[in-house]
Each structure stands twice: as structure tokens, then as C-alpha cells.
């Protein structure tokens, strides 16, 4: 059978190499070794060869694999903002030391986006929804682990989840947008903590409404709230607001360098990173006209 894949041109190789350099700078803190651990099937040796432009030994399939992961096409470039670094520090600490944290941050501060760039297979991020029941919450957690809870009881699903996590090296569960969960589902945080203390990292993360909800629940002696508050150390950690430098770096990484345009986007965004993304796209589209 004839190979119909297009050969990787020298020009495209140079573009992919530039995208790799940008990935190392913005996503891996300037460390090629860290980048190799974040990228799939891309060794530190490959990265060194590509950065030194000694490309003869690199196959086209390797180039294509790298392009999919760092390619500039129309993909939004992520920058290591203060919030990104803060969250990654907490995620790493919770994973390696089986710690438990409650994290809050205003919408648009990059919480969910940061969870999408965790380079570890043993991290399970539950994206909460208002419609979650106890069963659908457990089914989602099992799905993230590559397992099915179909046709089993909640107790059986919980048992599988716990046994699976206990066999993993440095596992971490992140319950994102936890303020969307009803009380009955939120109580699973207590059950998971009780079964996995010292064996698995646990994080609940949401907007500041979660803190208000927990504080109110503790004050009113609502069932389970004192237990949740105790397990996160009676303290919520706050994601820092994106700075002007953070937002300028994001704008520049995504193709806009004009100072006036950057300032305009910053002023309109109100430090909401989702708004920054929309404004950058609008500006780039306008420039094409």
C-alpha cells in the first residue's frame, strides 16, 4: 500500500521547532527535560536534536506527533501565569505528598485550563455538573480511570475506585467546579478522604462561592460541612488574579505584539482570561480583513 502521508518540509520543520521552543518556554519553565516528560513519545534526546537543527535522524512520524502537541495552527497558546504556576505547585504537592487542599479563584482565572495541562496519568480531574447524582459522580470518576460502573451499586463503585487508587503511584483527584455539586455528592469528598488519607492527593476547587457555602454550612452546623472544612485544613487557598504582565505574555504568545492593541485587550478583559482569548481572536480576525 502506498504511503499517502505528505512529507514534512524543511519550512514546516522550522515552524514545529519554533513551536517547541515556545512550548518549552511557556509550558515547561524553560526546561527541555520537563518538556519531554509533558509530551508523549518525545524524548529529551529528540528535543535536543530538534533544537540544534540536526534533523536527519528524526522521522516524519515523530515530526507529526510533535506538531500535534505543540503546533501553532489555530491552537491557543498557554502561558505560565502566576495562577498557572501557583496551581501546578499545589497539584504537584498534593500528588507527591498525598495532601488535601481547597482552592478558590474567580471565574476566568485559569483554574480549569490549568487542570487540562497536567502531564501525569495518575491525576483524575472530575469536571462537576449541577446534574450529577451520587451515581453519576462515581461513574464519571470510574470513567476517568478507564473503568465502568454500569450495573453496579454505588458501594461497589466506591470500592473499585479506592482499590484502584491504592494501587497507583502518587495519585491525585481534583474535583473542579465543586460548588456545582449538591450536598449529597459533595459528601463523597469526605468518604474519599477517609479511605485514602495519606495515600492519595485530594483537591476541591471552585469559585469563591464554595468558600461562602462551606463557611455558611459550618456556621449553621449543617451535616458534613464541618468535616469538609476540617479536611482541607480549615482554610481555602486563593488563585492569584492574572497580572498585567501575565495578560501581556498571553497576548504576545498568541500572535499580537502591538503595544496599543495589547493595552486595549488588557483594559477590556477585566483580567478574565476567557475574555482575553476572545478579544485576541477578534483582533487577529480583524487584522486579516
Feature-to-residue mapping (PLM):
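Sensor-1/coupling segment of RecA-like P-loop NTPase cores
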Residues: 102-107, 181, 193-224
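Conserved P-loop NTPase "ATPase switch" module shared by AAA+ and STAND
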Residues: 164-185, 189, 193-196
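Conserved AAA+ ATPase "SRH/arginine-finger" region at the nucleotide-binding site
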Residues: 126-131, 216-229, 233-245
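Walker A/P-loop nucleotide-binding motif
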Residues: 93-117, 129-130
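Conserved small helical "lid"/interfacial subdomain of P-loop NTPases
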Residues: 237-262
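Short glycine-rich substrate-engagement loop in P-loop NTPases that contacts/grips substrate
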Residues: 128-168
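The conserved phosphate-sensing helix
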Residues: 244-245, 267-284
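A short, basic N-terminal segment
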Residues: 1-97, 282-289
Amino acid at each position: 500500500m502506498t504511503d499517502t502521508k505528505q512529507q514534512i518540509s524543511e519550512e514546516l520543520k522550522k515552524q514545529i521547532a519554533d513551536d517547541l521552543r515556545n512550548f518549552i518556554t511557556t509550558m515547561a519553565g524553560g526546561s527541555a527535560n520537563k518538556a519531554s516528560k509533558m509530551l508523549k513519545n518525545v524524548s529529551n534526546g529528540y528535543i535536543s536534536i530538534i533544537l540544534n537543527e540536526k534533523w536527519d535522524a528524526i522521522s516524519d512520524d515523530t515530526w507529526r506527533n510533535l506538531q500535534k502537541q505543540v503546533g501553532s495552527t489555530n491552537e491557543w497558546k498557554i502561558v505560565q501565569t502566576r495562577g498557572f504556576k501557583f496551581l501546578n505547585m499545589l497539584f504537584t504537592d498534593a500528588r507527591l505528598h498525598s495532601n488535601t487542599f481547597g482552592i478558590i479563584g474567580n471565574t476566568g482565572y485559569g483554574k480549569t485550563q490549568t487542570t487540562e495541562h497536567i502531564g501525569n496519568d495518575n491525576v483524575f480531574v472530575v469536571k462537576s455538573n449541577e446534574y450529577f447524582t451520587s451515581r453519576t459522580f462515581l461513574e464519571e470518576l470510574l470513567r476517568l480511570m478507564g473503568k465502568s460502573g454500569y450495573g453496579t451499586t454505588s458501594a461497589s463503585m466506591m470500592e473499585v475506585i479506592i482499590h484502584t487508587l491504592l494501587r497507583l503511584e502518587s495519585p491525585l483527584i481534583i474535583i473542579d467546579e465543586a460548588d456545582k455539586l449538591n450536598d449529597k455528592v459533595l459528601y463523597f469528598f469526605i468518604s474519599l478522604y477517609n479511605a485514602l488519607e495519606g495515600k492519595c492527593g485530594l483537591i476541591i476547587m471552585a469559585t469563591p462561592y464554595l468558600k461562602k457555602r462551606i463557611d455558611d454550612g459550618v456556621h449553621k452546623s449543617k451535616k458534613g460541612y464541618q468535616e469538609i472544612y476540617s479536611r482541607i485544613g480549615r482554610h481555602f487557598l486563593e488563585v492569584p488574579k492574572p497580572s498585567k504582565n501575565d495578560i501581556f505574555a498571553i497576548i504576545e504568545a498568541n500572535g499580537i505584539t502591538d503595544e496599543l492593541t495589547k493595552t486595549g485587550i488588557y483594559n477590556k478583559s477585566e483580567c478574565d482570561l476567557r475574555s482575553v482569548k476572545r478579544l485576541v481572536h477578534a483582533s487577529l480576525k480583524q487584522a486579516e480583513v
